[in-house]
């Protein structure tokens, strides 16, 4: 579960329609481009057997969070230059590597490819739905950000706790809540872009990407838990 602090910056005053449309267009273009290194990273991870969590799960998670927040910091500092774009694409490659273990486990199931397809379709459906809602909901969702942030922190704490507890029911609950919370985050971030609250497309892309990533990975986990076939 990967948080992004940039989404909690002040939305500022409304921007001109032309500027908002440009940010939205550039965000969608960069978001589409970011899927290429993600897929590449996942492919490399699956074919090399990459697994950051092969050792101590707690230490591995702390290393992962350290690397992720390092990327966040670097992207934020360079978001107004081409370096920020390259760092974002590098981050999405890293996230693809991290996703490879889950994908590899899914592909080991008889219906794994179908489950991955369903998770991708479900994520696409949620993204489309939130995109439509972001342009039709008139109410400002900015106050919702604080509650979503608290929910995200609780999810991270629960995930770390479950490393020791190893409770399947808690894992399922965390994934269900993650899908709901990051779907809400997606709506929140998209509305900020549409309303001109976010004027940097690199920052906007990072926020939207993280929501999509978390929705997909948790949807896939749930599908595997409830509908996964026998291991091949």
Put a short name on every predicted segment.
Residues 1-232:
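A hydrophobic alpha-helical transmembrane-helix feature that marks the membrane cores
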């Amino acid at each position: 579960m990967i948080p992004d602090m940039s989404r909690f910056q002040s939305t500022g005053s409304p921007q001109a329609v032309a500027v908002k449309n440009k940010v939205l267009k550039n965000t969608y273009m960069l978001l589409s481009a970011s899927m290429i290194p993600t897929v590449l990273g996942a492919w490399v991870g699956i074919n090399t057997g990459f697994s950051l969590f092969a050792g101590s799960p707690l230490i591995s998670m702390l290393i992962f969070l350290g690397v992720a927040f390092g990327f966040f910091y670097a992207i934020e500092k360079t978001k107004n230059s081409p370096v920020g774009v390259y760092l974002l694409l590098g981050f999405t490659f890293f996230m693809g590597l991290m996703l490879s273990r889950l994908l590899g486990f899914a592909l080991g199931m008889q219906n794994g490819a179908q489950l991955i397809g369903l998770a991708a379709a479900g994520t696409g459906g949620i993204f489309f739905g939130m995109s439509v809602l972001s342009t039709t909901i008139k109410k400002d969702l900015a106050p919702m950000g604080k509650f979503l942030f608290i929910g995200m922190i609780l999810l991270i704490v629960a995930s770390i706790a479950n490393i020791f507890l190893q409770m399947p029911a808690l894992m399922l609950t965390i994934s269900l809540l993650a899908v709901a919370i990051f779907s809400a985050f997606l709506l929140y971030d998209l509305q900020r872009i549409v309303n001109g609250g976010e004027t940097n497309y690199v920052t906007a892309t990072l926020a939207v990407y993280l929501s999509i990533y978390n929705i997909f990975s948790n949807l896939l986990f749930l599908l595997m838990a409830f509908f996964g076939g026998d291991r091949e």
